[in-house]
Amino acid sequence: MASTLSTTFTGLDFVNPFILASAPPTESKRKIMKAFEAGWGGVVTKTIGLHPVENVAGPKTIYQRTSETKPYVSRIKRPDTVSHSSWNWELISDQPLDLWLPDLEEIKSSYPDRMVIASIMAGAGNQEEMDNWKKLAKSVVDVGCDAIELNLSCPHMDRKDMGANVANDEEIIRSILQAVKSAVSVPIWVKLTPASSSLVDGAAAAYGAGAASISLCNTFPSLPLMDPETLKFEVEVDGLVTSGGLGGLAILHQALQRVSDISRAFPDKSISGIGGIRGFREAFNFIVHGAGNLQVCTAAMEEKGSGGVGIKLIQELKDDLRDYLDHKGHSSIEEFRGIARERIVEHSQVRRKSENYNGGFAISA
């Protein structure tokens, strides 16, 4: 049986399931074109908005590392260390909509077989903001974008009516989706915050209002570390810091839990998996928990010599997925997507010790 890397996700045909997430790797036409040349199946643009954006006057992203010989997390690049996580307090794109539009049109015309998903964000709570959602959506679709991702997940927005600040309000989720759906007919993905005690309820509201997919997980709210000698944070401006987003390999297990929660609650719905993918092993785990599309960020940003778009990474992901499909005799990822669902159970359903069972250990005489 011939295998294929191509997938159909939310009605869109992807040449492969691997796409770059909304982040610095997709912040410009130059980077997106380079990503498509390297082989990525799609991109989610860095979030586009209408309100003025001004980032902090200092490093916007740092990379944390750890090792076995010195088991603490630090941004210091010692020779014995490996990647642990990324931390950022970067806001959405500071490039205005009128500059994005011709770039998006050129990108799509240059790579018609690649999927361009525009990440957009506006506020909430009044008709003016609902109109802003509509304007953003219609503008990006008119220049050729294949789908829209609603950013309801950024953990450190400069406004309280945006990003993760509104993602716990199911009525706001519905109202934003209704506004956007009234303006465009392309698939709408909703990127929800993982920092929610009612994530399944939020997903239910989104799916119920017409979302084609949920994207999980964005970065987790977090703080950088303080050095015990200098008393400085590893990233700060004038000695001050604010909550930022933790991503990369450190959030993999939490991301899988949340994808699993949504997938088990809505097994017939689509999920785009994000959070800690550095290679096929991590991607595989998102697929078996129900994700039909895979977004990558930190690993691409960290790859040296790639301009932050993961040139070697996408080749490895495609090669390893193709090898796995051939080895297992699968025709596509759909043949094993979601197979872990039935094996995730309540704690009370896991077997306890008994006279004849000792948790896999030998029973002493």
Question: Which residue stretches match the model-derived regions?
Answer:
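Glycine-rich, positively charged N-terminal anion/phosphate-binding segment
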Residues: 2-8, 28-111
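N-terminal small/glycine-rich loop or linker at the start of catalytic domains
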Residues: 5-19, 59, 79-86, 107-123, ...
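Flexible loop residues that form catalytic
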Residues: 23, 48, 153, 219, ...
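Alpha/beta enzyme core
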Residues: 33-38, 42, 125-272, 280-296, ...
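Active-site beta->alpha loop and helix N-cap motifs at the rims of alpha/beta catalytic domains
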Residues: 69-170
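C-terminal extensions of enzymes
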Residues: 287-288, 294-365
